[in-house]
Structures are given as structure tokens and as C-alpha cells.
């Protein structure tokens, strides 16, 4: 843990997500869902520190849009997994930062 955040380098490459039963209500865009979280993960994402309850903002460009997935630690305590707590299009400032960092 760096700065109290979970270590993204320990996440399982194939199955890193612990999806809560009520995750659907966390999506701010009606056309984004769990499949998009998988797309962000498989698109060589960048990670930015987040405000609680998330530890990280996982960002990647998917189909021309920068998507952001806030990640919280696994409820089970498994360091190989984390909980995505949303999925939405990045705000212009974060999208710009992501594109500069790429």
C-alpha cells in the first residue's frame, strides 16, 4: 500500500474485479456497464490517486472516449481483487491529463 491505497500491481491480470450485487446503480451513463469496466482494464489503463471511498481512478481510452472507473479495495481483503464503484466518461480535465500522460 502506497499512501494507504491498495497496490494495483498485485491485482489479478485475468479476474481483478469483485462486483457488488448492486453495482448497476453506480453507473452515471445509461450506456456504460460492467463490460466497459473490463474494456478499461484491458486497454492498458493509467491509475490516478482518488478520494475515498475509492483508492484509485483507473482511466483508459475506449472507442475514442476516456473512461474512468473508481476502484475501492476488495471487501474480502484479497489483494488480487478490487471493487469498481462506477464507470463514467472522464471530466475534460482528467481526460486531458490522461492524454498528456499517454
What are these regions (language model features)?
Residues 1-102:
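Ribonuclease/tRNase effector modules and their secretory precursors
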Amino acid at each position: 500500500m502506497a499512501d494507504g491505497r491498495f497496490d494495483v500491481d498485485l491485482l489479478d491480470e485475468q479476474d481483478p474485479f469483485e462486483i457488488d450485487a448492486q453495482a448497476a446503480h453506480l453507473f452515471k451513463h445509461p450506456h456504460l456497464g460492467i463490460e466497459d469496466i473490463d474494456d478499461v482494464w484491458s486497454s492498458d489503463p493509467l491509475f490516478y490517486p482518488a478520494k475515498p471511498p475509492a483508492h484509485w481512478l483507473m482511466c483508459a481510452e475506449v472507442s475514442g472516449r476516456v473512461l474512468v472507473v473508481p476502484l475501492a479495495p476488495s471487501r474480502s481483503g484479497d489483494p488480487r481483487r478490487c471493487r469498481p464503484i462506477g464507470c463514467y466518461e472522464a471530466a475534460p480535465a482528467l481526460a486531458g491529463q490522461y492524454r498528456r500522460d499517454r
